[in-house]
Amino acid sequence: MTLRKWQRVVLIVLDGVGVGGQPDASAYGDQGASTLPHVAERCGGLKLPTLEKLGLGRIVPIAGVDAVAEPSALYGRMLERSKGKDTTTGHWELAGLVQGEPFASYPKGFPDEIIDAFAGLAGVRPLGNIAASGTEILKQLGMEHLQTGRPIVYTSVDSVFQIAAHEEVMSCEALYALCEGMRKVLDRYRVGRVIARPFVGTSAENFERTSGRRDFAMPPQGDTLLNDMQNAGMTVLGVGKISDIFAGQGISRALKSTDNADGMRKTREALAQIERGLVFTNLVDFDMLYGHRLDALGFGRALEEFDAWLGGFLADFRDSDLLIITADHGCDPTTPGTDHTRESVPLLVWSPALVCGQDLGVRESFSDAAATIADLFDLEIRTGQSFMDRLL
């Protein structure tokens, strides 16, 4: 297949679906983490026939998933070169932007100068200002929030400033405006994301976060593959929280999603809407609903639901289309703690035109995905090593 024939690429990020600790995992406290294999083991095996045919079982041993003799996709693993294990860092590297300096994190709470700035915008000082699980902090502070109207601020070991507010106390629009204000404040502190966390409910027993979550990311500190594709006249559609992660930069149009099912549906719609360009999708439920909440069984069900959808989605592809399935970090629900884990990520690359699968080995950077897409469309490779020659 010649270079000019490639027309559409779909890049799907299974948020949090790592496949084993990186060599430096112990430096992040993540020795022994291996999200996908551990989820499969905890579930007593997974039924992933479509991913199995593509070659998933040849990347790492996964209970219930065979290492087929003749996989239909290129397969391998990618290591993260950037410092960190957060969503923004992982996605930026997938788009060709490697960070030498990690985002700042505040696991012991934010300093007074940041909280003072928040109070100036909100009109009140926040509750919380601690590192906590999103569901647990609602149990702890949700009722006080209802009584006082003070927003809840919390963080984690990742570079996030999260603001939770009940939808009857603060409208989503007001919460988003507050987050936008804090985004401007926090750029100079290198906080990766400000996250709006609206919730509903009447007591600690039934408080529940809604699908109104919004991420306000620090803008990428340089151009990415997305900018290059746009500048070359191609369409870049961001499904799920992709546009938020890139602060809208390089995104032709955003298709927000409420959950994995909606994200998968919109990915299929997006592919039908473009003739030349990229559909970049994030499916967040693996991480948000199951990894952080230590729900391995729910994680496994979500993977099986994705696999069932994927089988039908592949029928939409033309010979000139390419599919890349990967992840941005790990989020192992079987290890202590509720945070992300520093892991390698799976790499599956498929097209109807691909004659047979091959082993891509262990790639040295997530940016190899961006390098390959750039190579397919005859764009400059900013960083990473293209594996386009393996597609010909």
Swiss-Prot record:
Mn(2+) 2 binds at D287, H292, H340. Isomerase that catalyzes the conversion of deoxy-ribose 1-phosphate (dRib-1-P) and ribose 1-phosphate (Rib-1-P) to deoxy-ribose 5-phosphate (dRib-5-P) and ribose 5-phosphate (Rib-5-P), respectively. The keyword Glycoprotein does not apply. It is found in: Cytoplasm. Mn(2+) 1 binds at D15, D328, H329. GO terms for cellular component: cytosol. It comes from the Bacteria. This is Phosphopentomutase. GO terms for molecular function: magnesium ion binding; manganese ion binding; phosphopentomutase activity. Belongs to the phosphopentomutase family. It catalyses: 2-deoxy-alpha-D-ribose 1-phosphate = 2-deoxy-D-ribose 5-phosphate; alpha-D-ribose 1-phosphate = D-ribose 5-phosphate. Binds 2 manganese ions.
